[in-house]
Amino acid sequence: MIPVRCFTCGKVISEVWEEYKARVEERKMNLQHGEVLKVGDILDDLGVERYCCRRMLLSHVELVDVLAPYQ
């Protein structure tokens, strides 16, 4: 579960999460052998300019899927 707002500045970031995730997956599928995935332009296109908000999206890990079997 992505946080609704950036922990540092309070900007709403959850509204771009699904689009960000979809674009990253699409870009991964189109990578050539040896290429490195660069997501900076995806974040720029989505309007995520502050480095604190970019950090929130780049470092997020979906733990719900990992922890779900232990309910």
From Swiss-Prot:
Catalytic activity: RNA(n) + a ribonucleoside 5'-triphosphate = RNA(n+1) + diphosphate
GO terms classed as biological process: DNA-templated transcription
Molecular function terms from GO: DNA binding; DNA-directed RNA polymerase activity; zinc ion binding
Positions annotated to bind Zn(2+): 6, 9, 52-53
Subcellular location per the Swiss-Prot or TrEMBL entry: Cytoplasm
Enzyme class: transferase
Cofactor: Zn(2+)
Top-level taxon in the UniProt lineage: Archaea
Listed EC numbers: 2.7.7.6
One annotated Gene Ontology cellular component of this protein: cytoplasm
Keyword Transcription: yes
The record's free-text note on cofactor binding: Binds 1 zinc ion.
UniProt xrefs under Pfam families: RNA_pol_N
Chief location of this protein within or outside the cell: cytoplasm
Entry keyword Membrane: no
Keyword set, alphabetical order: Cytoplasm, DNA-directed RNA polymerase, Metal-binding, Nucleotidyltransferase, Transcription, Transferase, Zinc
Subunit relationships: Part of the RNA polymerase complex.
Functional summary from the UniProt entry: DNA-dependent RNA polymerase (RNAP) catalyzes the transcription of DNA into RNA using the four ribonucleoside triphosphates as substrates.
Membership in a protein family: Belongs to the archaeal Rpo10/eukaryotic RPB10 RNA polymerase subunit family.
Protein name per the record: DNA-directed RNA polymerase subunit Rpo10
Species name: Methanocella arvoryzae (strain DSM 22066 / NBRC 105507 / MRE50)
